[in-house]
């Protein structure tokens, strides 16, 4: 009898199994520095690959449109209860399929087409769903964007207030995809109160840090908080809506179903519940602290090697390297680090002269490799590996050396060591 899922899949669909096995090997052999990626536990994988995928369950626990939901109700309620405990929220909806779906449900609940929303410009570290013209949020609503201060490359709350007073948005959005500093939610609350706006925090990137107290929580300041459940939270890919207002919570529930989704993905919801349970344990708090320590170690090493970082460093899990300091584009740097089995992503920097397809920046993050057990000394070594190869501009001898150093780190900190590779037939 086969004793793991890959062996089962190889028996039934060897073509797909070989692809999945190849991806497992890629994850094992590469240093993952994409700030939005992480490695879930095998317990999360088990829940997501369970028989719960077979069940339709439109509605909410004990309010379903289908029969046979007694175990589904228990699984979803457990996930809800754990999410509320983890973040200190009065209400949680665990059904959004993604962070984008969670954000759109909030828009449906609070806004009408043509209303004004205000969020950070995508090129400064915002997100597509915060009013980018290529996203539905930028097509259905009037959008005004704020950015960072050109001198400090940090949020300028006085400038944000001035823009908010001028534009009077109905919804003010804070929370970002490429901002390496602490967000002061209390200052956003004061601005929202002054203009009578709803305040939404999208903490998709920092949710794990918020849950463990390593970043200030927005729950007591914001009308609604959205997040993904992967990234620093280390769960399955999915979304979550949180609020301290039970009445608003009912509106968000309706906006998710039937407003924007049909049947929830209960196997993913169960996996979210497992991840929330893991995040409630002391080990996860220690992990979150190490994520920040590792990020700062990598940032310090890169700056020591002469690289400029946006805002001069980091307070969280990510950093933005401004490659103009070495005369390189983000596209080129992304290609070069991939040649030595390091995975990152090109990224715009504030006031970037390059297009989004080229960029002047490289975004790096610490969550995934921290999950593998690496600490500050390993992240300093990673900083040196990146610096050595980028500064060499792809020299073959340096490439050979860097590949060996990357392999050494991957071998010392194995990924999913208990997960067997299936025999190719």
Curated annotation (Swiss-Prot):
SUPFAM superfamilies: PLP-dependent transferases (SSF53383). Its main location: cytoplasm. The record marks 230 as: Plays an important role in substrate specificity. It catalyses: (6R)-5,10-methylene-5,6,7,8-tetrahydrofolate + glycine + H2O = (6S)-5,6,7,8-tetrahydrofolate + L-serine. Transmembrane segments: none annotated. InterPro entries: PyrdxlP-dep_Trfase, PyrdxlP-dep_Trfase_major, PyrdxlP-dep_Trfase_small, Ser_HO-MeTrfase, Ser_HO-MeTrfase-like, Ser_HO-MeTrfase_PLP_BS, SHMT-like_dom. PROSITE patterns: SHMT. One of its GO terms (biological process) is glycine biosynthetic process from serine. Keywords: Amino-acid biosynthesis, Cytoplasm, One-carbon metabolism, Pyridoxal phosphate, Transferase. The modification N6-(pyridoxal phosphate)lysine is found at residue 231. One of its GO terms (cellular component) is cytosol. Belongs to the SHMT family. This is Serine hydroxymethyltransferase.
């Amino acid at each position: 009898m086969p004793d793991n899922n890959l062996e089962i899949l190889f028996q039934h669909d060897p073509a797909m199994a070989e692809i999945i096995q190849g991806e497992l090997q890629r994850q094992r052999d590469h240093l993952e520095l994409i700030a939005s990626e992480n490695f879930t536990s095998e317990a999360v994988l088990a829940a997501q690959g369970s028989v719960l995928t077979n069940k339709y369950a439109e509605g909410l626990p004990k309010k379903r449109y289908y029969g046979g939901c007694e175990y589904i109700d228990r699984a979803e309620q457990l996930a809800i209860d754990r999410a509320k405990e983890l973040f200190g929220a009065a209400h949680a909806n665990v059904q959004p399929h993604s962070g984008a779906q969670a954000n759109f449900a909030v828009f449906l609940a609070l806004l009408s087409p043509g209303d004004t929303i205000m969020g950070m410009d995508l090129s400064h570290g915002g997100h597509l769903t915060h009013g980018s013209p290529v996203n539905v949020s930028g097509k259905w609503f009037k959008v005004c964007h704020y950015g960072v201060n050109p001198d400090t490359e940090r949020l300028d709350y006085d400038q944000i207030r001035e823009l908010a007073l001028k534009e009077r948005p109905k919804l003010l959005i804070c929370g970002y995809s490429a901002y390496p500093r602490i967000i002061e939610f209390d200052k956003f609350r004061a601005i929202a109160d002054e203009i009578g706006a709803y305040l939404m925090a999208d903490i998709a990137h920092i949710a794990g840090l918020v849950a463990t107290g390593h970043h200030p929580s927005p729950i007591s300041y914001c009308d609604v908080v959205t997040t993904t459940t992967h990234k620093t939270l280390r769960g399955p890919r999915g979304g979550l809506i949180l609020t301290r207002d039970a009445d608003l919570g009912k509106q968000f529930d309706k906006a998710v179903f039937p407003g924007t989704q049909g049947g929830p993905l209960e196997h993913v919801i169960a996996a979210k519940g497992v991840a929330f349970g893991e995040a409630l344990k002391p080990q996860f708090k220690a992990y979150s602290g190490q994520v920040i320590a590792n990020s700062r170690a990598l940032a310090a090493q890169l700056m020591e090697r002469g690289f400029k970082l946006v805002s001069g460093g980091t307070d969280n899990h990510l950093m933005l390297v401004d490659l103009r300091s070495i005369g390189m584009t983000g596209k080129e740097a992304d290609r070069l680090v991939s040649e030595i089995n390091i995975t990152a992503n090109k990224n715009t920097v504030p006031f970037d002269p390059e297009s989004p397809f080229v960029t002047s920046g490289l975004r790096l993050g610490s969550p995934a490799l921290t999950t593998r057990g690496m600490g500050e000394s390993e992240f300093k070594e990673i900083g040196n590996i990146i610096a050595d190869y980028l500064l060499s501009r792809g020299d073959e001898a340096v490439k050979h050396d860097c590949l060996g150093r990357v392999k050494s780190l991957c071998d010392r900190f194995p990924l999913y060591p208990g997960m067997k590779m299936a025999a190719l037939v």
